[in-house]
């Protein structure tokens, strides 16, 4: 069996996976970075340290499950495909990927974390054919909230045109700050999602859009956080599942 090794060391997860296209098989190992209770993030130096500790462990676990041949290695090297987009935490994955590819004498490819999000979404949705056609993508995470027009690109897989972005908070930041108000561990997305699944109430929250130009709208998320803060102030953590 032959596969492709992927590595991602972003905030706040160490991730590695092997993809075998002939068998449509994905083996993955990932682990959240440890964030102290009550904290709303990590310094980049701490993130690099934890990635450096966790990545070898995950690669060992992945190797124990995959006994095949690695054809190539891919690694995330920046948050986005934009000038000046940089975070030190990606150096941990890049260093490991360079060493592995060099030792195995296989090709090494660099992609942005955002491209990885988009590719993973297409795979999960069963829309791999979209790699060959233009489509719209919404990247909603802790560090990015953007609407994109995505086109195929032979060199980078995707060419992205920014259509809209948040002006203040990113969606993930709002989620994590609300989670912090409720005393949930950081990052709070998974725990808030669990609480939401238990809720029988429905909330209709629409982002407010403001167009700088006809093709480049912007939207604010801070008002949504204020709404959630007000809600959080009226409930206890015990009853949080009834409101979120």
Locate predicted features.
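Conserved phosphate-binding catalytic cores of ATP/NTP-utilizing and phosphoryl-transfer enzymes
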Residues: 1-2, 106-135
């Amino acid at each position: 069996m032959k596969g492709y090794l992927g590595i991602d060391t972003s905030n706040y997860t160490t991730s590695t996976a092997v993809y075998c296209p002939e068998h449509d098989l994905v083996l993955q190992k990932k682990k959240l970075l440890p964030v102290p209770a009550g904290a709303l993030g990590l310094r980049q130096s701490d993130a690099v340290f934890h990635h450096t500790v966790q990545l070898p462990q995950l690669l060992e676990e992945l190797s124990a499950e995959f006994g095949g041949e690695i054809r190539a290695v891919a690694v995330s090297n920046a948050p986005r495909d934009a000038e000046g987009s940089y975070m030190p935490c990606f150096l941990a994955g890049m260093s490991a990927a360079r060493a592995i590819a060099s030792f195995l004498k296989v090709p090494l490819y660099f992609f942005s974390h955002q491209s990885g999000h988009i590719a993973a979404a297409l795979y999960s949705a069963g829309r791999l054919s979209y790699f060959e056609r233009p489509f719209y993508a919404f990247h909603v995470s802790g560090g990015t909230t953007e609407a994109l027009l995505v086109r195929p690109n032979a060199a980078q897989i995707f060419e992205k045109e920014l259509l809209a972005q948040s002006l203040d908070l990113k969606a993930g930041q709002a989620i994590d700050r609300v989670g912090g108000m409720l005393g949930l561990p950081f990052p709070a997305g998974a725990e808030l999602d669990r609480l939401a699944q238990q809720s029988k109430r429905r909330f209709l929250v629409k982002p407010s859009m403001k167009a700088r130009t006809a093709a480049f709208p912007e939207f604010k998320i801070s008002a949504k956080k204020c709404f959630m803060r007000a809600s959080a102030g009226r409930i206890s953590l015990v009853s949080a599942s009834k409101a979120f």
